[in-house]
Structure formats: C-alpha cells, structure tokens
C-alpha cells in the first residue's frame, strides 16, 4: 500500500449524502416521515415500494394507498418540505468529517462537494452543521445538467475548479 504524502493531495471532492452528512436514512424514509407528519402510519416496506418510482408515481401511490385527499403535487410539495426541514434542522455530519475537513483546510487543500441534492438543501445543512467554512465550492447535478451515474461531468468540473487533473 502506497503511503499518502499530504503535499501530494491537490484537492478533495466529496459527495454529501452518506459521506459528509448522515442523510441517507432520511432518503430511505422520506415518504414514511411525510406520512407520519400527516398522522398516518406507513407500511413497513414503504421505502421499497417507492424506491423504483418517480416522485409523481410515488405521490400517486400514497394518494391512493393511504386515501390522502391531496393532489399528487401537494404530496410532492409536502415531501419536499419534509426534506427541507431535515436538511435545515436535523441532519448531522458523519463521524470524523469535521476533523477531516479541518485537517484539509489546515493544509490549504481545496474541498468541493459534488451532490445530487438541491443547492438550497446543501447550503442549509452545511451552514447549520458548521461545515460550510471548509467547502470551497458546491457542484449540484441539477446545475451541471446531468446525474453522477450518467456522466463524470460533475467531478470533472470540480477537479477543474481546483486546478487538479481528474483522476
């Protein structure tokens, strides 16, 4: 195994959900959390049911399955509000993340975030958790115009911003 020399590190690109922030459980349970806010107990495997659906199809499923007297758009808006509240008020950094980011900052290593999450949620979470001061730039898939699984573009843009070769 090659020894890492700190002077060899020219930049760092981090995903946000599940890497910097302990947010994956929220994504697994957003529908359940929304229904709980409506006073409804979700079925135990709701996340599996919704996983393969678009937001619209998932909202229509919840509308029909739980007898919600809301439009699919209102349900989507409610789920989005649940997500917004989580990022703005509840999400916490993963263990060791603040220390790692402080270390990188101490050595003037640029840090970027490349995420599928919308900028408003990213900024709210990073500011509240105190991590924003360590991040030099945020790149979101919606702003880049393509998802991370479909293209390396978001990583290439982050590397270019830091003046480092993409590797």
Predicted regions: what they are:
Residues 5-107, 120:
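N-terminal helical cap/lid subdomain that shapes the substrate entry/recognition surface
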């Amino acid at each position: 195994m090659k020894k890492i020399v700190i002077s060899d590190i020219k930049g760092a690109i981090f995903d946000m959900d599940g890497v910097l922030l302990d947010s994956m459980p929220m994504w697994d349970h957003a529908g359940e959390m929304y229904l709980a806010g409506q006073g409804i107990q979700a079925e135990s495997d709701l996340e599996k049911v919704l996983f393969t659906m678009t937001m619209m199809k998932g909202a229509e499923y919840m509308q029909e399955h739980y007898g919600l007297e809301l439009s699919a758009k209102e349900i989507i808006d409610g789920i989005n509000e649940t997500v917004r509240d989580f990022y703005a008020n509840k999400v916490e950094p993963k263990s060791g993340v603040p220390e790692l980011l402080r270390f990188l900052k101490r050595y003037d290593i640029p840090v970027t975030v490349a995420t599928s999450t919308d900028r408003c949620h990213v900024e709210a979470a990073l500011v509240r958790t105190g991590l924003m001061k360590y991040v030099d730039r945020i790149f979101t898939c919606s702003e880049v115009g393509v998802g991370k699984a479909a293209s390396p573009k978001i990583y290439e843009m982050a590397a270019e911003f830091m003046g480092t070769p993409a590797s």
